[in-house]
Swiss-Prot record:
Residues that bear Valine amide: 17
Protein name listed in UniProt: Uperin-3.7
Subcellular location: Secreted
The UniProt record lists the keyword Hydrolase: no
Species of origin: Uperoleia mjobergii (Mjoberg's toadlet)
Annotated Gene Ontology cellular component terms: extracellular region
């Protein structure tokens, strides 16, 4: 769902940081 997409984005940002 939309929440899954948002969590995926957050995970990607955390990986960059």
């Amino acid at each position: 769902g939309v929440g899954d997409i948002f969590r995926k984005i957050v995970s990607t940002i955390k990986n960059v940081v």
